[in-house]
């Protein structure tokens, strides 16, 4: 790094661990499922304004919006955006039981601290990392360090993967980048961006896109005494039974798909996965009738460069091979990207990691390369972006579904963001 070590230590001395923990826990305590992020955004706007970092609430639609703050520099350097999201993937919302089963205590919007661990909805994805970026900006301000460029602080709504379909309509189901896309097209831009999504503080600059596909098969409504049970289940007039014959071919395709679409780049591998996320057919209160329609819902992640229509055509080819008449339709599509021109930003963050932890960052875990994040929209809009955020490295803490952070990781992330911000704003060119 070009930044002087003494300057870094001066800034790091202003990182208040107690205040960081307090802010993160306060944010966790505010429920902010997709579509209801306004109270969480306003808490952060108020927190920044109280510390003389100008911030405002950007409404996207009633009840949901973005938090935007700005730490001004001298005006002759690049603008760096820190970005996180306010909505949570796991919560105590009863609808979450549809996919999560029993709700774990750490998924509730009720923060608790046990020794060096903080539990609660969003502490990993993405409220804890977001608070680190705000605390980094506050430490920079308190230190009096001179920055050439501005730092833009953003917490967006509606990053979590959801899409309206069938009876599930309205703001709670509009996700996968709604807030980020609105923000970037309504005046909030930058030269570079650091997306503070959980990565175990690894550094990546590519993320997957995704498509949601609905598959429908048809049968005949039939009173149970008249139901037949053919040996060939694909000939059943029960739509649920008929749909069951599609699962094995789809799973076989999923195995082929991830091998054929694996994407290799400088941060490792991106392996786009396919997941059967839901199946709906019949009426639970009326099992004495054979259902005439059954729907199955699939997400397929996509590597950079893959067109959504090509994935749909792959699914259609699988369905045609089964001999079962089935309809398929896309109901969400976002593109995957690898950032171009992000090398100086990557170097700055690697240097920040070494400065804080006295070692090089670990290689990116493939699964964390293979997720969706709003990084893709930043890159689509021409902003070089990387992803780097704290998440537990201990596999017993279940980083894929757990919501628990080590305080030490939050503090280290905050210090890394301080160091990266100085390096970018004072030593990188504008884009």
Give residue ranges: language-model regions.
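Active-site metal-coordination/substrate-binding segment of hydrolases
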Residues: 77-152, 161-163
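Metal-dependent amide/peptide-bond hydrolase catalytic core
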Residues: 1-9, 18, 90, 218-431
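Short beta-strand/turn micro-motifs at beta-sheet edges
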Residues: 14, 201-205, 282-288
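N-terminal helical capping/dimerization or prosegment-like subdomains
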Residues: 2-93, 97-99, 293-297, 311-312, ...
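Short beta-strand segments
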Residues: 83-85, 154-156, 194-197, 216, ...
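Acidic/histidine-rich catalytic neighborhood of metal-dependent amide-processing enzymes
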Residues: 126-209, 429-431
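A structural signal for isolated positions on well-ordered beta-strands in alpha/beta enzyme cores
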Residues: 56, 81, 152-154, 327
């Amino acid at each position: 790094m070009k930044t002087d070590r003494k300057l870094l230590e001066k800034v790091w001395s202003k990182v208040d661990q107690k205040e960081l923990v307090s802010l993160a826990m306060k944010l966790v305590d505010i429920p902010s499922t997709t579509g209801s992020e306004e109270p969480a955004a306003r808490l952060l706007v108020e927190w920044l304004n109280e510390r003389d970092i100008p911030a405002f609430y950007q409404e996207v639609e009633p009840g949901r919006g973005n938090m935007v703050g700005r730490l001004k520099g001298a005006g002759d350097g690049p603008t760096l955006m820190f970005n996180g999201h306010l909505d949570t993937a796991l919560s105590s919302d009863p609808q979450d039981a549809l996919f999560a089963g029993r709700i774990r205590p750490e998924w509730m919007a009720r923060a608790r601290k046990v020794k060096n661990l903080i539990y609660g909805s969003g502490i990993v994805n993405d409220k804890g990392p977001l608070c680190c970026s705000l605390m980094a900006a506050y430490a920079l301000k308190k230190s009096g360090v001179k920055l050439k460029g501005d730092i833009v602080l953003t917490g967006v709504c509606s990053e979590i993967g959801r899409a309206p379909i069938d009876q599930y309509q309205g703001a709670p189901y509009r996700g996968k980048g709604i807030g980020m896309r609105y923000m970037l097209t309504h005046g909030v831009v930058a030269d570079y961006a650091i997306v503070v999504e959980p990565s175990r503080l690894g550094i990546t600059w590519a993320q997957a896109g995704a498509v949601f596909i609905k598959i429908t098969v048809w049968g005949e409504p039939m009173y149970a005494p008249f139901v037949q049970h053919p040996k060939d289940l694909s000939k059943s007039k029960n739509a649920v039974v008929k749909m069951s014959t599609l699962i094995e071919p789809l799973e076989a395709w999923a195995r082929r798909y991830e091998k054929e679409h694996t994407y290799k780049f400088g941060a490792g591998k991106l392996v786009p996965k396919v997941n059967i996320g839901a199946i709906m057919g019949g009426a639970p209160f009326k099992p004495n009738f054979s259902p005439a329609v059954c729907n199955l819902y699939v997400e397929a992640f996509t590597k950079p460069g893959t067109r959504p229509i090509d994935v749909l055509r792959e699914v259609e080819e699988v369905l045609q091979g089964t001999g079962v008449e089935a309809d398929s339709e896309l109901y969400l599509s976002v593109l995957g990207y690898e950032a171009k021109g992000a090398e100086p930003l990557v170097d700055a963050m690697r240097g920040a990691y070494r400065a804080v932890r006295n070692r090089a960052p670990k290689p990116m875990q493939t699964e964390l390369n293979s997720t969706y994040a709003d990084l893709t929209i930043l890159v689509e809009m021409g902003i070089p972006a990387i992803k780097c955020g704290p998440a537990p490295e201990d596999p017993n803490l279940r980083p894929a579904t757990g919501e628990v952070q080590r305080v030490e990781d939050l503090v280290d992330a905050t210090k890394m963001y301080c160091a990266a911000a100085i390096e970018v704003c004072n030593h990188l060119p504008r884009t």
